[in-house]
């Protein structure tokens, strides 16, 4: 019995867990055949030693696990210090799950690389799941010993790894020499798995962020519709333009400036839907609506607002042709969708539509009492073109042009104010009220 037993263990030198099994359990008491075998470690163990060569990893019988002293004494004769229990398990415990490994540096280079590859993939997956399930911002950076850097970042934190400043800071930190361990308790505590995690960094969360980036309530603010019976717009790709405006607590746009050369009109100032003057602001050949925000100078477009795409279904849209531009950064979103419709559309209690020579805006309840605002007048408008362009700087522009040419309206004389949408279900969106300031100082009908 003893020679057979020694022959079964010889050549291993690593204790019971790595002993070689001779035959079908012959020579080792307590070991049964293929049926009803138990392993000391499961296949999902993360110790980096799953790929064992043939002959390693002995499988022991159930009766040996129940009696570790007898099985151990008979199975490891000549090897003092080796026990019959599984490494990392309590005596007498039937281990079928993962084996706990020591939290220390792995000296074996192959095992270390295998562990890094598996655990790096796992922590990247966990970061993605955390950001997706909870809608939080996550930044993860893993630098390997071979000099490769792996990152995962959500939208708001991507500049940390994509901007030149962020990349330079990361390179500086990684290229700095590894400082010896210091006696700083805060540093040791941050590097510990059980240390404090919260930092002194904070940031403000808006309502749109807290409800999810993809679930912002997008309510239409105004609608441009072709009136039945008017045939001035003939070659237009869209006869109904619907633009949606959604904002959080504050709207950064403060002013729109009209060019001084277009001072042909009189005051058009709306206060609560009522008109204080009935004149027109004449803009030759068309106008340009430019998305802008922040602190701006005259004649200079700004770049704080991005226009996102938002598809909207309308029951009256027979043939819908949409022009969509998408951008990914900014603090305020102006989703814009363009669709065709053959009838006027009323959205949120307000309507905007073109007449043969002007684009008019009024609340629906103000149509009968004269509460009509003429926003733009064309000297001659046989056709009108709606187009979107986006330059490399990320500034979205919406052009409404007539054939003679295009006149840009930079930021100056049209003020935007917030107004709650009547009958709106969501409390996070606001309707923007448009005010046109008089540019003709000699007009006697001017009201402040």
Swiss-Prot record:
Pfam families: SRF-TF. Residues 201-211 have a biased composition (Polar residues). Keywords: Activator, Developmental protein, DNA-binding, Nucleus, Transcription, Transcription regulation. Residues 1-61, 173-223 are annotated as: Disordered. GO terms for cellular component: nucleus. Residues 98-152 form the MADS-box domain. One of its GO terms (molecular function) is serum response element binding. Binds DNA as a multimer, probably a dimer. SRF is a transcription factor that binds to the serum response element (SRE), a short sequence of dyad symmetry located 300 bp to the 5' of the site of transcription initiation of some genes (such as FOS). Together with MRTFA transcription coactivator, controls expression of genes regulating the cytoskeleton during development, morphogenesis and cell migration. This is Serum response factor. The lineage of its organism: Eukaryota, Metazoa, Chordata, Craniata, Vertebrata.
